[in-house]
C-alpha cells in the first residue's frame, strides 16, 4: 500500500548578518555583502539557530538617551539617535565622524556645532545644534532605530545634515565638530575639533550644488569676451583658395576639423589662419578674435592713430602742449640752456593771455589740463 507523501512548502528564512565594523546585526538588501551603514564588507552570516537580538532593549535605551538629551539641551538641537544591539556594542564613531567631515569638506557653516559622543554603551548620538537658530521644543526630535538595523527606515546622514544646514540663519558664526572619548580624532588623539565659519548658502553642498555653480559659470562665460566683429570688417576678410601644398600639409579647419580640399574657397584671417566661411562667420558675429590665437580683428594695432584720436578729442591746446614737450626734450638733448616759457607756469599763463585775448573763458576753463614730462609738471 503506497503511503501518501505530504510535502510542506515552507518559506525560506531570511539570512541574518552581523557587521563587525558597526557591531550590529543588519539585513543586507544587496548581493555584494556590504554593510548598508558603513559600506564595509566585514560582515558575517549568522547561523539560523543563533538567538535573535532583542530590539526592545536597545530601542528603549536609545529612546531614553534621546529624551535625556532633549531635556538637557537648549531646545535648538536636532538629534539623530541610532541604537545598536543590547550586547553593549557601539556604532563606529570614527567612521561616522569621517562621513561628516567628508560631507562638509571644510565648508564654512554658520552657527553650527556637531557633536558625536558615545551614548553609554548601546548607541551613539549625533547632535546637530545651531546657536541662534530656529527655536524648537524642549524635547529634542529623535530618530531611533533599535535592534536590527533596517536601512529603509534610516535617513542618510548627508540628507540629515543638508536639511539642517539649510535651516540655519544667515548670521555670522562658529561651527565645531567634536568627537567624544573613544572617537579617535585626527592624529590619534582622543578629541578632535574642527571649526567652520560662513554662510552655507554661499557654498555648494553635494553634487547638485556643484553642478549648479558650474552651470552658472558657463552661462556667464557665454556673455563675456571680446565684442562681435562688424559686418563690414567680416566682409573685408579675403577669400583664398586651397592649393596642393596646403592639402599635402593636412591643413584643417580648426572649427569643424575637416580637411581642406584643393581649390576650396576659405576665409583667411590677418593671422594667416584658414577657416570655412560657414564656420568662421558665426564665430565672428559673437567674438572679434581668431578662435586659435585670439588675435583681435577689430583694430589695426596702430598706436599713432589712437594718439591722434585722443588729441583731437581734447582739442588743439593739448596738441600744442604735446609739441612744446617735444621741443623741451629736444633742447635738453642738445644741451641748450635757453629756458622755455612753458617751464615757468606764470610766464606761460601771461603769454597765453597775450596770444589768445579773444579766447572763450568757458573754453579756457575747460582746457585746464595737467601735462607731464620727465622733469616738470605744469598746468596749462
UniProtKB/Swiss-Prot annotation:
<dbReference type="GO" id="GO:0000209">
    <property type="term" value="P:protein polyubiquitination"/>
</dbReference>
<feature type="compositionally biased region" description="Low complexity">
    <location>
        <begin position="338"/>
        <end position="350"/>
    </location>
</feature>
<feature type="region of interest" description="Disordered">
    <location>
        <begin position="317"/>
        <end position="367"/>
    </location>
</feature>
<dbReference type="Pfam" id="PF14369">
    <property type="entry name" value="Zn_ribbon_19"/>
</dbReference>
<keyword id="KW-0479">Metal-binding</keyword>
<keyword id="KW-0808">Transferase</keyword>
<dbReference type="InterPro" id="IPR039525">
    <property type="entry name" value="RNF126-like_zinc-ribbon"/>
</dbReference>
<comment type="pathway">
    <text>Protein modification; protein ubiquitination.</text>
</comment>
<dbReference type="GO" id="GO:0016567">
    <property type="term" value="P:protein ubiquitination"/>
</dbReference>
<protein>
    <recommendedName>
        <fullName>E3 ubiquitin-protein ligase Iruka</fullName>
        <ecNumber>2.3.2.27</ecNumber>
    </recommendedName>
</protein>
<dbReference type="GO" id="GO:0004842">
    <property type="term" value="F:ubiquitin-protein transferase activity"/>
</dbReference>
<dbReference type="InterPro" id="IPR001841">
    <property type="entry name" value="Znf_RING"/>
</dbReference>
<dbReference type="GO" id="GO:0005737">
    <property type="term" value="C:cytoplasm"/>
</dbReference>
<dbReference type="InterPro" id="IPR013083">
    <property type="entry name" value="Znf_RING/FYVE/PHD"/>
</dbReference>
<dbReference type="Pfam" id="PF13639">
    <property type="entry name" value="zf-RING_2"/>
</dbReference>
<dbReference type="GO" id="GO:0061630">
    <property type="term" value="F:ubiquitin protein ligase activity"/>
</dbReference>
<keyword id="KW-0862">Zinc</keyword>
<keyword id="KW-0863">Zinc-finger</keyword>
<comment type="subunit">
    <text>Interacts (via N-terminus) with CG7546 (via Ubl domain).</text>
</comment>
<feature type="zinc finger region" description="RING-type; atypical">
    <location>
        <begin position="253"/>
        <end position="294"/>
    </location>
</feature>
<dbReference type="InterPro" id="IPR051834">
    <property type="entry name" value="RING_finger_E3_ligase"/>
</dbReference>
<feature type="compositionally biased region" description="Low complexity">
    <location>
        <begin position="55"/>
        <end position="68"/>
    </location>
</feature>
<keyword id="KW-0833">Ubl conjugation pathway</keyword>
<feature type="region of interest" description="Disordered">
    <location>
        <begin position="50"/>
        <end position="92"/>
    </location>
</feature>
<dbReference type="GO" id="GO:0051865">
    <property type="term" value="P:protein autoubiquitination"/>
</dbReference>
<feature type="compositionally biased region" description="Low complexity">
    <location>
        <begin position="74"/>
        <end position="89"/>
    </location>
</feature>
<comment type="function">
    <text>E3 ubiquitin-protein ligase that mediates E2-dependent, 'Lys-48'- and/or 'Lys-63'-linked polyubiquitination of substrates. Recognizes miRNA-empty Ago1 and triggers its degradation via polyubiquitination independently of the Bag6 complex. By targeting miRNA-empty Ago1, eliminates dysfunctional Ago1 not able to bind miRNA and thereby plays a role in the quality control of miRNA-mediated silencing.</text>
</comment>
<dbReference type="GO" id="GO:0008270">
    <property type="term" value="F:zinc ion binding"/>
</dbReference>
